[in-house]
Amino acid sequence: MTQWEVVIGLETHAQLSTVSKIFSGASTQFGAQPNTQACPVDLALPGVLPVLNRGAVERAIRFGLAIGATVAPRSVFARKNYFYPDLPKGYQISQYEIPVVQGGQITIQVPANEKAGKQAYSKTVNLTRAHLEEDAGKSLHEDFAGMTGIDLNRAGTPLLEIVTEPEMRSAAEAVAYAKALHGLVMWLGICDGNMQEGSFRCDANVSVRPVGQEKFGTRAEIKNLNSFRFLEDAINYEVRRQIELIEDGGEVVQETRLYDPDKRETRSMRSKEDAHDYRYFPDPDLMPLVIGADWIARVKGEMPELPAAMQQRFVEQYGVSAYDAGVLTSTKAMAEYFEALVAKAGAANAKLAANWLMGDVSSQLNRDGIDIDACPVSAAQLALVLQRIADGTISNKIAKEIFVTIWDEKAADEGAADRIIEAKGLKQISDTGALEAIIDEVLAANAKSVEEFRAGKDKAFNALVGQAMKATKGKANPQQVNELLKKKLG
């Protein structure tokens, strides 16, 4: 039986976070009434000329530097000719032979798949190019009975199309790459990453070939996948479809396909064009884009610290594990919250801060369906909670209760933790005399557990600790309780 190898390449359209469009001054704001953000340039009225948005170019440079690519000192805009109702000019301004960003790579972390018996691993995906282009408008098929409406608000919106080499070998790798890229463009501040609004969408080129064969199989391109789940489902379906088709004696046709999320299948949209079908030629209305070394140096100087460098710094500066550093730098907002937390709580509490962020804080964020930048507990408020754990004022259990109280109250005061501790009398009991008296009562009331412990049953000791903590309503210092119990039990 033939063993098949999957070959995947992704083309990702990232909408650049400029206020105006790539060749006009019209707004890029999402959600406006149809055709209220389309100026004469976007409408392709006679006599208008495009003017390149400098901000879009700088965002492309920033991306190129982040992935270790070559930023072309000279690149050219080209006309991509095709007809579609939502493309007013009859062509799209893009880049073809000389893109602004050439090469580069992104390292991805592919998670383990226990069902398939596969362990987690890392892989470097090479990029072919990233080029600037304008978006088309939008066809509205459901708003008018028997007719199609055209909304040109998106026409001219700046895009960075990021193209990989066909190096991914599974849907899991493709999703891992898409997530890594998504995180990077948001980290760099060049794209808001909003997939629901179409700011980040992927086209997947999928083919299969017998294992060991060098020649690529015929590919199908699945267009406009705007969620990671859709990307994974679409690729998996397409792989199955192609293998079944070939094994049944058929041939895969080069075509463009759409993914139907309701049926969880791809369906044919049109035959796939080759580059020559678009009759690319340099746009005579736009000068070649020249990017000098001084411009690149200035953009580089304004770039944020990149995730990989920050991960290494967290390991060295704060003593957290490489895994923890990866989680803490999963988003820029998470990394900034962690650094603000450590700055307030003290470097000595860095590991405690990391544990809380990855544990209780992340749990609450998931519960409420929000991101860290919308966390109702500020870094300063949480830092005070951690300081009170560290100085023995409260136990970790009580700290969790205080944290949830601050979260639910949406308290604004930085000293909320101290206020709640005083108001509810939550200070940890650390007085040895008071604890000894409580433990004596616990031992007297739990003679059976004492006997079991002395008979060698360690679980009985944990039961006694639990009774002591219950007697103090969780306010006893757990470490002291353990020490005093061991002392009294001999």
Curated annotation (Swiss-Prot):
PROSITE patterns: GATB (PS01234). It catalyses: L-glutamyl-tRNA(Gln) + L-glutamine + ATP + H2O = L-glutaminyl-tRNA(Gln) + L-glutamate + ADP + phosphate + H(+); L-aspartyl-tRNA(Asn) + L-glutamine + ATP + H2O = L-asparaginyl-tRNA(Asn) + L-glutamate + ADP + phosphate + 2 H(+). Transmembrane segments: none annotated. The keyword tRNA processing does not apply. It is an enzyme of class 6 (ligase). Its EC number is 6.3.5.-. GO terms for molecular function: asparaginyl-tRNA synthase (glutamine-hydrolyzing) activity; ATP binding; glutaminyl-tRNA synthase (glutamine-hydrolyzing) activity. Keywords: ATP-binding, Ligase, Nucleotide-binding, Protein biosynthesis. Pfam families: GatB_N (PF02934), GatB_Yqey (PF02637). It comes from the Bacteria. The keyword Protein biosynthesis applies. GO terms for biological process: glutaminyl-tRNAGln biosynthesis via transamidation; translation. Heterotrimer of A, B and C subunits. Belongs to the GatB/GatE family. GatB subfamily. HAMAP family: GatB. PANTHER family: GLUTAMYL-TRNA GLN AMIDOTRANSFERASE SUBUNIT B MITOCHONDRIAL AND PROKARYOTIC PET112-RELATED, GLUTAMYL-TRNA(GLN) AMIDOTRANSFERASE SUBUNIT B, MITOCHONDRIAL. NCBIfam families: gatB, PRK05477.1-2, PRK05477.1-4, PRK05477.1-5. Allows the formation of correctly charged Asn-tRNA(Asn) or Gln-tRNA(Gln) through the transamidation of misacylated Asp-tRNA(Asn) or Glu-tRNA(Gln) in organisms which lack either or both of asparaginyl-tRNA or glutaminyl-tRNA synthetases. The reaction takes place in the presence of glutamine and ATP through an activated phospho-Asp-tRNA(Asn) or phospho-Glu-tRNA(Gln). This is Aspartyl/glutamyl-tRNA(Asn/Gln) amidotransferase subunit B. It comes from Burkholderia pseudomallei (strain 668). The gene is gatB.
